[in-house]
């Protein structure tokens, strides 16, 4: 089992984060896009810096507001995705996290969402990349892992799978037992986080009060 940590979990420059992650003996990183945007080098330079420290770039995140969109916005998002794929190939990163849509323009149509994610996965497959779909606890139409899995099942593409995040499941008091019914090969990535029990908006809770596992 590979162990990765999200760069957003640590403070400092991206270089400092990589050094700390390597010192903690992780195998790789989840690259948070704002960390890459603030990086002064190229994607290939970042890939080499990570490799020199013994780290892989396991996941690129997040890709927002994609599925369930009207046709024109969907086409624009496909173009946006292709540019992310360009970056991922330079980084040597095989997996992109697509989080469930929060846009007011999105449509609550699971069939549409599945078809659009299928098209995204098909484009990713042409580059030997994969797509992981994650239910955000504050998603407009999809906020539970079972809803996300339903869409992944409908999309039915080998390069599309599920990403699970313990915070998004447990913050909504959702029952995680159903995860055992999902085929393991369809779960592409698992993120573990802890948090204190707080009565507050789930977005602010997620962004400002998440802890490392076991530190809740």
How would you name each of these model-derived features?
Residues 1-3, 55-58:
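Transmembrane beta-strand segments of Gram-negative outer membrane beta-barrel proteins
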Residues 15, 52, 67-162, 171:
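Active-site acidic/histidine proton-transfer and metal-coordination neighborhood
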Residues 28-29, 60, 119-215:
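Acidic/histidine-rich catalytic cores of soluble enzymes
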Residues 40-54, 82-90, 175-188:
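Short amphipathic alpha-helices and their capping/turn segments at secondary-structure boundaries
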Residues 15-35, 84, 91-94:
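Catalytic domains of carbohydrate-active enzymes, especially glycoside hydrolases
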Residues 34, 65, 101, 165, ...:
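Flexible loop residues that form catalytic
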Residues 30-51, 100-105:
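Glycine-rich, proline-tolerant flexible connector loops at the mouths of alpha/beta enzymes
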């Amino acid at each position: 089992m590979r162990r990765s940590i999200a760069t957003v979990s640590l403070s400092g420059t991206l270089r400092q984060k990589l050094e700390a992650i390597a010192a903690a003996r992780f195998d790789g990183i989840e690259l948070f896009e704002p960390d890459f945007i603030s990086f002064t080098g190229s994607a290939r330079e970042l890939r080499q810096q990570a490799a020199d420290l013994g780290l892989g770039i396991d996941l690129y995140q997040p890709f927002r507001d994609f599925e369930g969109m009207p046709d024109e916005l969907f086409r624009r998002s496909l173009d946006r995705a292709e540019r992310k794929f360009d970056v991922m190939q330079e980084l040597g990163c095989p997996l992109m996290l697509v989080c469930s849509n929060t846009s007011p323009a999105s449509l609550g149509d699971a069939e549409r969402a599945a078809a659009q994610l299928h098209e995204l996965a098909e484009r990713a497959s042409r580059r030997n990349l994969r797509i992981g779909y994650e239910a955000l606890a504050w998603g407009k139409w999809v906020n539970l892992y079972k809803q996300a899995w339903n869409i992944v099942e409908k999309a039915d593409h080998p390069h599309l799978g599920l990403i699970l995040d313990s915070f998004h499941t447990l913050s909504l008091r959702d029952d995680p037992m159903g995860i055992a019914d999902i085929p393991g090969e369809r779960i592409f990535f698992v993120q573990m986080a802890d948090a204190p029990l707080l009565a507050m908006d789930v977005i602010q809770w997620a962004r400002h009060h998440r802890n490392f596992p076991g530190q809740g």
